[in-house]
Amino acid sequence: MKRVTTYLLAIIFVLISIHSKSQQLNAPDYSDYILTPAPPLSPRINGPSIYGVRPDSPFLYRIPCTGERPINFYVEGLPAGMSSDEKKGFITGSTDAKGIHKVIITAKNKHGKDTFEFKIMVGDKLALTPPMGWNSWYIHYDRISDATMREAADQMIATGMAEYGYQYVNIDDCWMRKLDSKDPGIGGKRRDENNVIIPNGRFPDMNAMTEYIHSKGLKAGLYISPGPSTCAGYEGSWGNEALDARTFASWEFDFLKYDWCSYRKKAKDKSREEYIKPYKIMWGELNKLDRDIVLNLCQYGMDNVWEWGAEVGNCWRTTGDLGLERGGDLPGFYHIGFSNAEHWQLAQPGGWNDPDYILIGWVGNAHEMAEGTPTALTPHEQYSYMSMWCLMAAPLIFSGDMAKLDNFTLNVLCNHEVIAVDQDPLGQQARIVRKNDRDFVLVKDMSDGSKAVGIFSLVNQAVKLSVKWKELSLKGDQQIRDLWRQKDIGTYDKIYSTEIPAHGVSMIRIWPDN
């Protein structure tokens, strides 16, 4: 009897353990917290209103558009050398016609149509609005593969993220061969007889992979370090910068994250010249190419990179890794965001302060390079996170599991009115106009003369917060729209007050009442 009892207790313990593990691995259902309205069945064209390309560079742009498919796309005013695909909604080609080309895009389906003015700026600048897309690091780490990248591209289309402007599908570290590894899949000869870098066994054909990503109208990104090795110990670009740049272009990549890592062993000193040097070299090599590659500087904010980053790149990390930020009473993204917000005057079209990726949905513990688990952030903290990044004109690069995107996470990532704040062509980053232990307020001037404002709660309970017009340099009656709910909430004079949940946000847009 005792043996049977022990056996039954063991079974119960195992079942409890399995149930507990199952509970831990199931994302909480936050559907009751969804704020973003579903898009209409009729077409709605989203995304930036301006896009940069260099003369004669290949151009690929997938028109972001929600609405029931099929949708037909009609594009007028394209420069010579460019054309559009009516069924796919892709704009492709190349042109040597420098200047700003005003293009009218019309999208039609059985429910209606939408028209959108889109400017193609042919010149020297790329990334005229902050890049949007996905990066593999915080979910796949050293497990990344060709198959995972293709799946991410598939999911960017299937989930609708592409219809809101997400376009880059970026590999982070660990695609090369690893130094001193005995694993035949990732170790071995790191460069061929011509010194061309060799991907590891998980990436059998880079050209086939980028072709697959491009076939969906999306763009492909890559990662490497200017040092001898990457942060995870894989082959770096040291001494092969020009060759690597040409190789990445021949593989048809569109984005490069260039991570300081082991370059610290090569820098002569801590002078500004030495901090700039590796990025200046790669920037120069990329600019020689006949392909546009956006350059993301990753060197953790050293030597006030925000003061010189625009000279040698398109966006630059202003802090250490967000995934390694421990946080405290407030989640880590607040601390990273506060630091990034200080540099608002130095953001501009073509050059953006980068506070790191959006870590919601399923993400892996960066300290352990672990498998993904549901984010510990509350729903209101996730709204605050996305609001802060959009107000700061940050690159919107999601780095969670693309295969486990639930409706709540998509509602945070895919609100076109919130994203429009990030993608505003004026390119101004929000500034902090108030910050104390209870709350802080960000305000961003928009190209149409309105202001986007975020009122953030820093306390652990719901609280009524206000913002006065004098804090925002406003006078008189002002119309206010709730951006998350996409709803006009009235006309206010001198002050706006609202109840905000713990660690939550009220993100609004304000226009004069005339």
Predicted regions and their residues:
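C-terminal beta-strand-rich structural cap/linker in extracellular carbohydrate-active enzymes
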Residues: 491-514
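A short beta-strand micro-motif common to beta-rich folds, especially ectodomain repeats
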Residues: 63, 99-111
